[in-house]
Amino acid sequence: MNGLARAKLMDKLMTVVFYCVAGFFILLLVSLALYVIGNGFRNFSFSLISFEGSGLGNLLFNTLYLVFLSLLVSVPLGVAAGIYMAEYAKAGRFTRFLRMCIETMSSLPSIVVGLFGYLVFIVMTGAQWNLFSGALAVSILSIPLIMTVTEDAFKSLPEGYKRGSLAMGATLWQTIYKVLLPACLPRIMTGVILAAGRGFGEAAALLYTAGMSTDISWSSWNLLSPTCPLNPFRPGETLALSIWAARTEALAANSAQLANLASAILMLLVLSFSLGARCLSSYLDTKSGGSK
C-alpha cells in the first residue's frame, strides 16, 4: 500500500471515529434527558407542582426569580468587564494580574463561593438567609464566564468595524455602543445562556446563602413582607436545593418522587431556556447582518 492510499484510509478511519464520538455524546445526552424526564413525570399529578403544601410551585418560582436576580447583577458587570479587557486594557502587569484573578474566580468551587457569601452577605451584614445573597453568590460564579465570552466576541470582530466607525468621527464609546456591541450580541447571549444554566442547577453556593424556606403568600404583595413573592430579601428554597434535601433529609413521604420531578423540571428548564435563547441569538445575528 503506497503512501497516498494509506493517507486516504487513515482519513476515512478518523472520519468514522469522529462521527462515532459525536454520535456517542448525542446518544448520551438524549438518553440522560429521556431518563430524567421520564422518571420524573412517572406517576405525575398536578398536586406535586401546586403552590401549597409540599408542591414544587413555590420552588420553581424561587428558582426562576433567583436566576433573574443573578443575571441582573452578573450580565452588566460581566459585559462591562469584557468590554474593558477587549477595548481599554493595556498590556502590562495590572492586566495580567486582573486576568489571573478572573481565571481564579472561574475555577473556584461553588461550595467555597457559598461559604464566602455566607460570611460576607449574611454574617457581616447581620442578615438572614435570603434570595439576593444567593443571587450574589451565583453572580460570582457567572461573571467570569460572561466576561470571557464578551471579550472573545469583541476580539473576534473584523478590525474594519472599529476602524470604519472611528474614521467616520465616532468616539470609542460610540463605536462600542452603536457598532461593536450590537454585532457581539449573539455571542454574548451564549454566555448569558450558560450563566443562567449554572444558576438553575446551583445548589452548594445557595445552601449557605439562600436558605430552605418555601413560605410564600401569594396574597401579600408588600415588598417588605417576609412572605411576599417578589421580596428579594426573604429566604427561598430552589429546585436544586430541594433535590439535595429530598435525598439527604427526606422529610416528606413522597420525597423521592418530588426529587425526581424537580430534576425533570430543571432539565426541561435548561433545555427550553437554551433553545429559546438560541432562537433569540439567531434573530439578533440576522438582524445585525451577521448571518451568512
Model feature map: region roles:
Residues 103-141:
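Generic hydrophobic transmembrane alpha-helix motif, especially the helices
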Residues 61, 65-73, 77, 81, ...:
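Hydrophobic alpha-helical transmembrane segments of multipass integral membrane proteins
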Residues 71, 149, 172-212:
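Transmembrane alpha-helices
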Residues 2-20, 34-72, 91, 245-256:
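Periplasmic/extracellular loop-to-transmembrane helix junction in inner-membrane transport proteins
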Residues 27-30, 34, 75-83, 112, ...:
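Membrane-embedded alpha-helices of multi-pass transport/permease systems
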Residues 70-102, 115, 123, 277-286:
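Transmembrane-helix boundary motif in ABC transporter permease subunits
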Residues 48-54, 206-266:
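Interhelical loop and adjacent transmembrane-helix boundary motif
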